[in-house]
């Protein structure tokens, strides 16, 4: 039996490799392994909890410099005195607000999910983007304050 979904996943993984975006390629290959093994029984759990777990891991990565002491408290305090840091804070708030609206939209209008997923994968693969909110916020900040 021909599995169109598997073919699509393989194509997207290939696109990830061709564009040198291992994040996309490895993620899709993991999903392919789950799909073709008995691990496929975990798909409902992955679909329900995957985004939350990803956000937790991302947040750990973002907060690690504070927890490790690499980013000292004095730097955090001074961030409220620098206009670029204030722009970063404002953009972060706006992006998280938009993210909340996006989660609600994806939950209520499932017909948009496929387009969002394809657009995300293509954007990540073709433009070497990263599918995460905080890094998008940083990208927006770089547009406002200039890339330095």
From Swiss-Prot:
Membrane topology: Multi-pass membrane protein
Keyword check for Manganese: no
Subcellular location: Cell membrane
A Pfam short name: DUF441
GO cellular component: plasma membrane
Transmembrane residue ranges: 14-34, 51-71, 86-106, 121-141
Domain of life, source organism: Bacteria
Entry keyword set: Cell membrane, Membrane, Transmembrane, Transmembrane helix
UniProt family annotation: Belongs to the UPF0756 family.
Protein name per UniProt: UPF0756 membrane protein YeaL
Annotated source species: Shigella dysenteriae serotype 1 (strain Sd197)
Lineage summary: Bacteria, Pseudomonadati, Pseudomonadota, Gammaproteobacteria, Enterobacterales
């Amino acid at each position: 039996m021909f599995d169109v979904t598997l073919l699509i996943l393989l194509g997207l993984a290939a696109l990830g490799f061709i564009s040198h975006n291992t994040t996309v390629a490895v993620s899709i290959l993991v999903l392919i392994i789950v799909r073709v093994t008995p691990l496929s029984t975990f798909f409902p759990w992955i679909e329900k909890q995957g985004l939350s777990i990803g956000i937790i891991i991302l947040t750990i990565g973002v907060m690690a410099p504070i927890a490790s002491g690499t980013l000292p408290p004095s730097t955090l305090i001074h961030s409220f005195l620098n206009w670029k840091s204030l722009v970063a804070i404002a953009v972060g708030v706006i992006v998280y607000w938009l993210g909340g609206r996006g989660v609600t939209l994806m939950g209520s209008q499932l017909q948009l999910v496929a387009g969002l997923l394809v657009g995300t994968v293509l954007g990540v693969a073709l433009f070497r983007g990263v599918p995460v909110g905080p890094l998008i916020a940083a990208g927006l900040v770089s547009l406002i304050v200039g890339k330095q």
